[in-house]
Amino acid sequence: MEISKYKAVLALVMLQFTSAGVALFTKAAFMEGLNPTVFVVYRQAIATLFICPISFISAWRKENKPSLGVRGFWWVALTAVIGVTVNQNAYFKGIDLSSSSMACAMTNLIPAVTFIISIIVGFESIKRRSMKSVAKVIGTGVCVGGAMAMTFLRGPKLLNALLNQDNTAWLLGCFFLLISTFAWSLWLILQVPIASHCPDHLYTSACTCFIATIASFLVALALGNTHLPPWKLDSFLKLSCCIYSGFQLAISFFLQAWIVSQKGPVFSALFNPLSAVIVTFFGALYLKEQTYLGSLLGALAIILGLYIVLWGKSEDYQEESTDLKLENEHNTSSQSDIVSIMIGDKAFRSSELLEPLLM
């Protein structure tokens, strides 16, 4: 078989390895003294410097220049504050206080939390007689139960049992990771109004990164990082961690956008547990992170719940894709397919995703 058929799979596997690398890299840098809040500023700034020139060149080559408008700008600003600034600060503070394996396991809660928020805001409805709708509810419950087990039912130590860890710091770290999960889910929800104001995904992402950099810098100052010492990258590990994480953030955007355009959002989410497995193994091996029976069982429950939710979501995506195909058959003026990105039962479309994002 041609290897081109497996490009999306290879890209997703690579993305999971790079994401796992960020979790492990940052935990090691935090153990050496890197401030998580300062790290977020550096990461966002590097990602912005990478994305903005590409966005400018892409917009310059188009006949219809992208524009957000006043309302679109406020939606992007809200996304930058909640979905990026709050999300990343909470996520990396959670890694600092708990472990990188816990952080990666918690990210598997995102589809379930997004499902809950989608119901609240009206993007999703529960069909009692639909098996897949019931599956989404059951999967969400399993995910929540797994998260509670990871947080409170730690159980006996399986790896690195001789090391001690502060229980209060662990619980606080889990709390920050849950905040990050909700902020991440809100970021997904907010893509709907943003796309309705400006369908240029690259342009809106560049704007989001730029605003998030400013917001993250203000948060860092507000938390007391007003002197030079916290901002010094006085070791190779700290410097390389910031550079690697910044480029990974920028590159992951291109990979995710391309994968969604090829295979859809459900396919992309199926690979999320891979990073948790990678981080758990290497975290215990190199960072001496403690592994608990309760945490391991909770992580397995979250992964099980994730796949149950995704099985239920697959019907929504398939139905929407079928409707779009029928619509495109009757639309003779359109020469390209339209990709639907599902958020709940509703979708927003972006033909921009069909542009060659990976060269």
Swiss-Prot record:
GO cellular component: membrane
InterPro entries: EamA_dom, WAT1-related
Naturally occurring in which organism (per UniProt): Arabidopsis thaliana (Mouse-ear cress)
Top-level taxon: Eukaryota
UniProt-recorded name of the protein: WAT1-related protein At4g28040
Main location: membrane
GO MF, one example: transmembrane transporter activity
Signal peptide region: none
Residues that span the membrane, as ranges: 10-30, 37-57, 66-86, 103-123, 133-153, 170-190, 204-224, 240-260, 266-286, 292-312
Family in the record: Belongs to the drug/metabolite transporter (DMT) superfamily. Plant drug/metabolite exporter (P-DME) (TC 2.A.7.4) family.
Organismal lineage: Eukaryota, Viridiplantae, Streptophyta, Embryophyta, Tracheophyta
SUPFAM superfamilies membership: Multidrug resistance efflux transporter EmrE
Membrane topology label: Multi-pass membrane protein
Keywords for this protein: Membrane, Repeat, Transmembrane, Transmembrane helix
Domain EamA: 18-131, 199-310
Compartments, as annotated in UniProt: Membrane
